[in-house]
């Protein structure tokens, strides 16, 4: 995994960030499972589409170095809130969800009005974001913490909050995973 991460940091990330319309990238990994997620954010759909041809060889090389087959998902940044910036040693808990596409706005409102304020009270909380795929009814929420220890200490509180709010939002939890945040250069604006 280290060779893939080194390639991403040294070559892929600088190349993508230099592309017109790129507003940042992030990378998180779970070294135990080998799962690595790299995100790029764009100022518009046109900007993202214009980068496709240049990104494919970088993505393919990263996949080979990481020992896996990369796949692409496209998400709308629906909400983003930073309590404070992340730093080296920060970690991320991500939750993938699915519900009826027509309920996504209800879920977004709950995230903004209930989930984010509750998360701000958790020790070590840095930021939270919600991404939507309106066509499929899928969503992913990520919460960043100052350290693995703080993320672990909040696990029970986060689980209770997640179960309560996903029930109210009428969404099913597909997966929950925890990652080390290896790169956080996202310049997307606050959207709370």
Which residues does each PLM region occupy?
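Short S/T/G/P-rich N-terminal loop/turn motif that feeds into the first structured element of a domain
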Residues: 1-36, 43-192
């Amino acid at each position: 995994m280290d060779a893939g991460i080194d390639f991403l940091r040294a070559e892929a990330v600088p190349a993508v960030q230099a592309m017109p319309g790129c507003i940042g990238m992030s990378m998180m990994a779970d070294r135990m499972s080998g799962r690595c997620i790299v995100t790029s954010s764009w100022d518009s759909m046109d900007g993202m589409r214009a980068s496709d041809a240049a990104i494919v060889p970088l993505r393919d090389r990263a996949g080979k170095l990481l020992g896996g087959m990369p796949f692409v998902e496209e998400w709308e940044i629906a909400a983003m809130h930073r309590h404070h910036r992340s730093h080296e040693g920060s970690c991320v808990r991500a939750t993938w969800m699915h519900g009826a596409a027509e309920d996504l706005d209800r879920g977004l409102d709950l995230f903004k009005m209930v989930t984010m304020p509750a998360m701000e009270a958790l020790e070590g909380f840095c930021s939270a974001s919600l991404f939507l795929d309106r066509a499929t009814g899928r969503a992913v929420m990520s919460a960043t913490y100052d350290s693995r220890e703080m993320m672990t200490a909040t696990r029970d509180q986060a689980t209770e909050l997640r179960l309560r709010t996903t029930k109210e939002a009428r969404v099913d939890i597909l997966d929950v995973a925890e990652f080390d945040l290896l790169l956080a250069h996202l310049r997307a604006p606050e959207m709370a």
